[in-house]
Amino acid sequence: MRSGQCAAGAPVLQFTNCRILRGGTLLREDLWVRGGRILDPEKLFFEERRVADEQRDCGGRILAPGFIDVQINGGFGVDFSKATEDVGSGVALVARRLLSHGVTSFCPTLVTSPPEVYHKVLPQIPVKSGGPHGAGVLGVHLEGPFISREKRGAHPEAYLRSFEANAFHDVLATYGPLDNVCIVTLAPELDRSHEVIQALTAQGIRVSLGHSVADLRAAEVAVQSGATFITHLFNAMLPFHHRDPGIVGLLTSDQLPPGHCIFYGMIADGIHTNPAALRIAHRAHPQGLVLVTDAVPALGLGNGRHTLGQQEVEVDGLIAYIAGTKTLGGSIAPMDVCVRHFLQATGCSVESALEAASLHPAQMLGLEKTKGSLDFGADADFVVLDDTLHVQATYISGELVWQAEEAGP
């Protein structure tokens, strides 16, 4: 924890000649950083009568909040759902490699697995601050096993579960301690799901609806019970129907609690979601859209077979299938690619595309005071981008942690 006294004595960095994303607008302003946080320059000038200790010219580039990926199953040969004696080293490798894609924080995601896998893996993935070693870990996302058999997608049917009479006790028996967990994806049509949603949210865990055949009413009741997120909208759920739009209908439902914003993940990899579907969702509910990669261990690798939890996926070009099927088995597109594709597919503003990968996931997790923005007092986690939104440099707590060759600052 950075104390005020330590921060006050730290050097002041001034990033100049840049466009910073703040308040939904790209502003031609300087970015001031001290002690790992975004600094208000007026207080520096008028209260402390100080100037910057160091200036860095950004060459007119964009400075945006660091990307946050709340659904990533692994990457670069690492499978988060594989129970080993040293899960941490794999998480560290992925965290390090994500820096080149502008990701400063992420939620390692475990797909449906037997209880012994959760019991072994979860204690090995603690919440961890980011830095030169890699992107920060915000908590684990547990996707399954309490999901629909019909909409299980890439999840192995043998390990799917329903809630027993003592529902939350069953959750704890399956997962073990939830200290390192920040999101749980479940199907709201399962019996006793609302009891579980209430228990999870009481512990500060976000509940996401997904891999589900729920109708709209069941989804609305789940949100009224505390659910706040939808896992990869359109994928692994009932298709939109005009008489019952299912979970998709939450985007425009008038039955949600007053002031409640439902967030929803979208895989904008050019494979999982048609551009027209991206446009429909964004135009219906832009402030809730959260870009996710749903990346699998094959991210960053070539064609061939790779693991995903208890199954294998086969990569063919830009597509990952469950081996021997035509069922999609996650994505192999990193977050910066998803941001660029989303921008092109929807025709939205650059600001909107960047906020979908930063501010919105931070808001969904309740971290918007420290992550996902360049507001004064927020963590100085940001990405430097050129006009085509290619990553030039990544900073965590104001420290340069990755830089493209021949790029600055």
UniProtKB/Swiss-Prot annotation:
CDD domains referenced in this protein's UniProt entry, alphabetically: NagA
Instruction: Provide one Gene Ontology biological process annotation.
Output: negative regulation of UDP-N-acetylglucosamine biosynthetic process
Endoplasmic reticulum as UniProt keyword: no
Which GO molecular-function terms appear in the entry? metal ion binding; N-acetylglucosamine-6-phosphate deacetylase activity
Q: Does the keyword RNA-binding apply?
A: no
- Residues at which substrate binds: A154, H155, N235, A236, R243, D269, G270, I271, H272, L328, G329, G330
List the InterPro entries. Amidohydro-rel, GlcNAc_6-P_deAcase, Metal-dep_hydrolase_composite, Metal_Hydrolase
Q: Which family does it belong to?
A: Belongs to the metallo-dependent hydrolases superfamily. NagA family.
State what this protein does. Hydrolyzes the N-glycolyl group from N-glycolylglucosamine 6-phosphate (GlcNGc-6-P) in the N-glycolylneuraminic acid (Neu5Gc) degradation pathway.
Q: Can you say what this protein is called?
A: N-acetylglucosamine-6-phosphate deacetylase
Organism, scientific name: Mus musculus (Mouse)
